[in-house]
Structures are given as structure tokens and as C-alpha cells.
């Protein structure tokens, strides 16, 4: 077994320290230095979980609960959650008051609708929590082998584990808690771990236990085993772990290399032994399971204001009515006789007692508040939740946003922000993996001052297209001009990750080059300085590489293709097959890995210290140019000038560059370094990282330059077209990238973010004054001068814009300048400049800066922001934005797990916003407006009837008519509108992207439109009430000669309202489906069915509605004629207004509908008329780009 394990290990082994979830160390690095104040109080007695010392610590058990409720707390807690909503609380108060004599209706009719709405939501909450409970039980009852204390292991449930337990986890099992790895089935205590449940990554990580515990590979070895661990307190940082283990009187440092996280899985390893360090809710995965930031859409926030406005209206009407009622009641008694004798004051000592009119007015106020509660739509919240869930399903099922290659559909991870997708003003995008494929290809390099590689990048092709001529590449060495045809340019490399072509160094020809020794060191560094795992296919014996980043894979593949094949790795060695410069033969060389100084976004470099077979010590380093050039020795700068020029050329071509350098170490220097780095790593304190950084700074210096690499990260398919279409929609696009400024600018041109003849405002600190200060000045002086310089450049930029004459501008700013631009006293001036530009590119941006820029844009202009990214370094930006969109690419799933919506490719953003965003915004906006319209139409008739009856608190309708209006007779059509309505089809949404501005400018949910719908409700109620009253008043209603009473008038008005609100819905719908026809007409049919069946019930149940339809309304011709006349008269004003609006001042979607109706959608002239009609000249967005393009054409015309 051990022999087989060793064989597998040789195929897959890697430096485990670098493979403990390092992909996101950058964004958590700062938090690590702040862990818990003192933060290192956890003490673990390994193999002694029941010792008195361990018991006194009172650490949490391993039972995990993710439910919101327990059986005891479900009812009170869920009710509390429901009644936190103001509307629900209002209906609760009116429901309670319905049990008092003050109620104008029966208590049951008031409570049943509330119970229906609250009950539906509680059932949903209960089902969801029950599912969570089932999942919790499944996890907590899993079994794992635990040491009994006598050298044997028994299976126990996860929930019974205690701190200090020794557990045995076998292949393909999940780790039950956070463990310190002690040993494994491999001799050197390594194991393979899959972290899919933590970060979504499928590539395996390798962990390794301490050498001192690696021999504990049998169960009986743990009899008598004792160890003492002191480590950091529980925290949410997945990527750090600091601690020490005391064993046999010696202390050993612990790091993420030894930490096995709960819910990750053991793979390709037969078993491991580990000590439980964190349990239950102290484990890092549970610490990370807090809810994401709560986000609410702008429409939802505005809806709350409308609810408050409706409350104010209800209170106002109740107050007016109670005052009038009080005055009338006071004047009711004249000469001992009651004017309104039918109110029977003798039966009620308070309500209608003229002697106590103020008290009667107060009681009337409470009654009126209950009666007018129908102004507030009780089913609004539930209906919106249902609609949003169904909208999300449509987004998830959209075949046009399904990425077949990776089998990844779009996924709305929350339905709260659907309508917000239709109001995005600014998009803030990452570049690598978001705009690009994050699939790196080694294409060029500079070695010893000589440029190699003749590949042509997409950016170079775009530059050629901008200049309008053929693409010409000039070789440095041969001065040969080569014009590449389209076929040659697009020819794909036969080796993934390698698109390098240059016969001077391929096929071993590098040995004849002038600086062959430098070339050898260059590619040897690529073959050795990395964290890649080699894998051997047992059938073909071909080696493939598993790397944490595509850059690393590209470097190793390039080294292999050029004669330096990395083929094996152990914990302490790397094996490379390479061409010997002296003998000319391929030889196998073994490099002993002594130390690894890992890469992170702060260091921007990675180094390894290796020992060659002859004992020579080498430090091999690769990193970003801005940190590497300053670390070169005086004698190591021989090729610096040429390399800098080449790096700038590569950046112009849109390539990602790294500088390669090395130095030889003497044994004494290395010995001192190794002692200091070991001491720093052994430190158990919050400044451990800074101590390590301090030590590495002293060794990574005096380097000798070898050259630079250049890899291409190609744009994703459809990115330029998508950006162009989003710009046409008037959406501003910012790109936040860690690339060099030159690279970012040229990528901007390649992806249509920048246009030729767009003027550029560039803000950076590469000025002679600042550079001279950096060499001689102090930090405070440099910072002050830099800040003043940035402010000056921002002000100059604003001046340029002011006198630009309408020219389009692009703002480009680097990371150093951005740090000062985000200071509190400058950031608002910077924002004013940025939002006035057509495009903004922030270069060399850190993850923190991305989040700060997003926060600034969101809070600064008050409009909706959308952030899109694919990596862990984008998480802060995604959570800060109003909407976070994660790209499910190749950098793991952390961005997706922190996002609101996930898509597989950037190009799908076009359809997500312009189609689904526009539809959802329109649907939700119209739905909310209609909800308030139909409730005002219904509720205001109650007020008018109250006025007609001198505010006697008598409702116009039967109790159950009141209760079921919002539930059965008017709710389904509005839900159907929210799910299915389309003002224009998806095709025309994309063809006329400016339609999207209706959402950005909030045209469909402005106060003007909201108040317009409210006014529609008020005048509809007035028309219905007065026409019905006038038509029925003082005349015989049927053949018996009876005049209509409350039941007849109320039944007639109610019928008219049901017809009006449902036909109003039909007039508001733009796109009819069979479902909409069914729900509209069925709502009317259900009303007639209900009034018939309800009226047949005994009179003690149906009260005034007893046989009112069958015996009074239906037989009467006037009832049907009045219904027809009132419905037509009520809807006619809206119909006339819509016709006039469409004819004389159509909205943008109306113009598109007219084009479609007239069949002119394919006529370019008509389409241009429609497009231009909605465009206002501006210096941002599409019109600015269009003007830049036109000027470019005009400028080039004389030359042609």
C-alpha cells in the first residue's frame, strides 16, 4: 500500500504550503493581521478531550445548526419577522380591533385574509427551514472513527466530537471538523484535499503534517500519544492558520499546510489521522456562512414610501370623517328629537350619542381606520415575492444564457434584485477572467535583452484595424517584415497554453544564441520556480500539469516545449529534464527545494530557494516589473533598458508580463535567513505575516536580471460587441484591473471600451518631481506631494472636460494615484471627473481599491451600480455593489458564491440587463402601480359611500366582499402581468438598446407615474360611485317596485369595480398570453360564481348578500345596463389618454411598438429615426462614442 502511495505521490506531489487555498490570500491578508485582538488563546490537549483542563475551556460542541427556527421558536419568531413589515402590522392592529364593537365588519372577514397572507409566508418559511433541518441531521449524524484512548478507533457521530479528539478519516470522506493533520497513509504525512464545498475549486490541494508526527501511521501508535496545541481563536479566514504544537518538550510551528477544513474531502489518500482543533460553529466554514449583505432594490425602497403615503391618506380621511361625524352627531339632537333617528342612539350610549360627540368622533376615527384599510394592498408583498421567484426561474432557464461548453446556465442566486437589473447606470468590471478567458498562452519573451516570439495578439490586431492598415511585425534580430494574413493570425496553437513561434530558440536552437547561458537560466527558472503538480497518464505516459493559476501552467508548458521539462516533484525536490549546454545531451537534474516564498497581491512576486546537485544555492524569483526592477543589483542590470522597452511593447500588445531574476546565495547568508524565517513562522502572534515579510525582504534583493515573460489572456467571445451594446444602452462601464496602464489601455481598445479619437485623461505619479522625491525624500513628504499632484491632475482633467466642446473623454488612473484619489477630501472631486467621462479604467488596482471605488460610485451618484468579476479578489467589489454578478470561470467559485447572479460568460450580461433587466423592471413597476390603483379604486368608493351616509361607519359592501377583493377577484391578473408581460420582444430589446434608459431614468416608476396611477384610481372610484348612485337612486329597481338598498347599490358597484380593474389590466398589458386571458376573465367569472353561491347560503351566514344576485341583480336589466355603461365610462379616460400619448408624445417603447405594428422594424431609415429620437448629446455613454467614431471618420477622409 505504501509503495503504491509513493508512486502516486511522485506523480502529484506539490509544495503543500502553497496549495492551501492560496487563490484568495490576497483579499484576506489584511484581516489576518487583525485576528481577534490578542486572538491566540485557543489551547487544545490532543488525545485528552476529557481532561479537566480541556473541560474548563467550554468550547462549542460539534453540533451544527443552520436553521432559523426551532420547534419552540418557530411561531413567535416567524410571526415577529412577518409583523416587522409595516403593512402587516397595520392589518394585525385592524384585525384585533375587528373583535371590538367598533368594527364595521365581522372579525372573521378581517382576520381570514391576514391569516391567508401570513400563513402562506409562514408555510414557505417552515418548509425551507424543515429542509435545512433535514440537511443538518444528515450532516450531524455522519460517522467518523475516533480514538478511544486504548489504541483502537470506534465510529462515532460527528455531533459527538470534542476538541482534542484524534480522528481517522478515510478516502473520499469529508473532514468532520477543523483538524490538524498528524499523519497519513503516505510516509511523509501528505494528503490530497478537495475543497469544492469551500471555494468551488475542483483542483486538488496537498497538505502535509509535521515531520515529528508523520510516523504515527497505525492506530495503536496513538495509545499514550499526547500533544499540546496553542493556536489562533476561531475566525472566518480560510487562508490562514497560526499555531504551535508542543510535543516531547519541543515546539513546532503550525500553518495552513497542516490545517484540514471541515467539509473538504480527502482524495487520493487512503486515510489520515488528525486532531480536532475547531468544532461546530467555531469551524472556519461555518464562520464563513454568515448571510451576505442585505440588498434591497430602489423600487422596493420607494414602495415603502408609497405605503407610508397610503397610511397618511388613510389617517387623513379617517380624521376628516371623524371630525365631520363628531360635528354632525353633536348637532343631531334638536328640541329633544334626533334628526338621524335610524341610528338608534338609545341602543348605543357612545357611538351616536350627541351628548358625548367628541368621544363618538374618536371611536369613529378608529372605525374609519379599519374601514379604509382596504387602501393598503394586503397581498402586495406576497404577490411580489411570487412574481420575483418566477422571474428568477425564467432567468435560470434562458437557453440564450447557457454556456454549453462548460454546461453552466445563468443562475439568479437571489430574486430580490430582479428589477434592479433594469436600472443599472454603471458597470464596474474586473478584467482577467471576466473580460478575458483567463486561459493564458505563452506567446513572447525577452531574454538577455533580446525579444523572442512572433505571435500576434488580439490587441495588436485591434491596433492594426484602428490604424486601417495591414498588421506588420518587425523582428528585432532579422529586420524582416512579416505581414500576417487573417488565417495566420487566427491559427490555433497545437499545445494549450503555448502559442510561441521563434525558430531561434525552439528545437534546441537556443544553444547557438549569443547569451545561451542566460537563456538556459531563464527557462530553468520557469521549470523550477512554481507550484505545479505533474500528472502522468498511465496509458500514454504523457505528463500534464495541474496548476492553481493558468499563468503557472503556461510557464511550465513553455519551459517544457523549449527543452526544460518538469516531470516529477516530491515534498523537497523538483526534477527537470533539460538540455545540457556543454554536452548537448538531455539530462535529468534534481533540485532540492529549501524554501518557498509565496506570491500574494502585496508582495507581487514569488521566490524559491533551491540547491543544485553541485551544492550551489540559488534564489529564483519572478514578479511584477514595478517590484522586480527595484530589487536588481548594480551588476544585475545589464539588460534592464532593453527589457523595460520590451515589457512596454508587450504591455502595448495587451500581454501580461513578469520579470525573471535570480541570485546566488552563500551558505552563511542562507543559514542566517533560514533561522530567521523559521523563527518568524514559529511566531504565534498577529504580526507573524509582517515578521515573515521582513525576513523575505532582506533575501529578495541584489537580483540579476534574466528577462521577462509575456502571456496572452484572450478576450472572451462577444466581449467587444457586448460592451458596445451596453454603451449604446447608455450604461457607463468602468474596468478595474491589476494590469499595467499600457496593457489596460490597449485591452480597452480591443474590447471597444475605448474608441479612436476619444481624448484620454491619464492620472499617474510617473512625473519627474515625484520620481526624484521617491529617490531622496521621506515618506511623509512623498505622500503629501503625491496627493497634491493627483488633485492637480484631477482639476486639470475637469478643466479639459469643461472646455472640450462635447468631445468624448476616457479617464485612466493607476493604483498609486487611485489610493490618493480615494481620500475623503478628494474622492468626490475625482467622482465628478469620472462620471463625466465615457469610459474609466483603473489600473494596478488592489482588491480593496476595487471595493472602495465601487462604494464611491454607488454612494456618490445615487444610481444603481453593478459589479462583475470572477475571482476571490473581486468578492469585496461584488458585495459592495447594488448588484454583484459572478462569472463562473476557471478561478474557482468564490466570486459566484458571493454574487447575486451568476453567469458563465461576460457576453451574457447584454441579455441579462437589456432583456431580463428591462422586462423585470417594467413588470414590477407596472405591477406595483396597478396594485395601488386597484386598491384606491376599491377603497375610495368606501370613503365616498361613507360621505354619502354622513360618515355613519357603514361599509358599502358585504363583509366577505371586502375580504376577498384582494385575494380572489383582482390578484391573479397582476401576478400574471408581473411574470409574462413584455412591452417589446427580446429581439427588439437588443435591437434598440436605448430602451434600457427607461429603467435607468426610472421613467416607469417615477412619482409622476405613480401619482398618475393613483389619480386613475381616484377618478375611477368617483365615476363608479356617482354613476351607480345616480342610476339607482329614487327609482324602482325591479318589477315589484322596490327601491335599491345598500345591498343592491353595493353589489352593483362591486360588480363594476371587478370589471373595471380587470379590464384596466387588459388595457395595460402589452403582450397577451393564454394564461393572462384565463386569469383576467376567470377573475370576473369567479366573482359571479361567488356572489351566486354565497347568496344561497343561509342568511345568518350571507347576511345582506342573501339571494341578492339571484333574486335582485341578475333579473334586473338595469343592473346589466348600468354595469356596461359604468365600465365603459370609467375606462374611457385612460383609453383616450393612451391614444393621445401614443400619437403625440410616445414613450420609447411605444415607438418600437409602432415600428413593429407598421412592419417597419427592418427598415434602416425608420429604425434610425426611432434610435435618434431618444438620444440626447452627452459626453458619456453611446453618444460620446458615436461622436468619437464620426470624428475619426471625418479626420481620415482627407487622407483617403
Curated annotation (Swiss-Prot):
The record's section on Pfam families has: Cation_ATPase, PhoLip_ATPase_C, PhoLip_ATPase_N
TM regions (residue ranges):
76-97, 102-124, 307-328, 365-382, 926-945, 960-979, 1010-1032, 1046-1068, 1075-1095, 1113-1137
Q: Tell me the Gene3D superfamilies matching this sequence.
A: Calcium-transporting ATPase, cytoplasmic domain N, Calcium-transporting ATPase, cytoplasmic transduction domain A, HAD superfamily/HAD-like
InterPro entries per the UniProt record, alphabetical:
ATPase_P-typ_cyto_dom_N, ATPase_P-typ_P_site, ATPase_P-typ_TM_dom_sf, ATPase_P-typ_transduc_dom_A_sf, HAD-like_sf, HAD_sf, P-type_ATPase_IV, P-type_ATPase_N
Keywords (A to Z) from UniProt: ATP-binding, Magnesium, Membrane, Metal-binding, Nucleotide-binding, Translocase, Transmembrane, Transmembrane helix
Tell me the compartments it is located in.
Membrane
Q: Which reaction does it catalyse?
A: ATP + H2O + phospholipidSide 1 = ADP + phosphate + phospholipidSide 2
Please list the residues that make up the active site: 430
Q: What does this protein do?
A: Involved in transport of phospholipids.
Name this polypeptide is given: Putative phospholipid-transporting ATPase 9
Which PANTHER family does UniProt cross-reference here? PHOSPHOLIPID-TRANSPORTING ATPASE (PTHR24092:SF175), PROBABLE PHOSPHOLIPID-TRANSPORTING ATPASE (PTHR24092)
Family from the record: Belongs to the cation transport ATPase (P-type) (TC 3.A.3) family. Type IV subfamily.
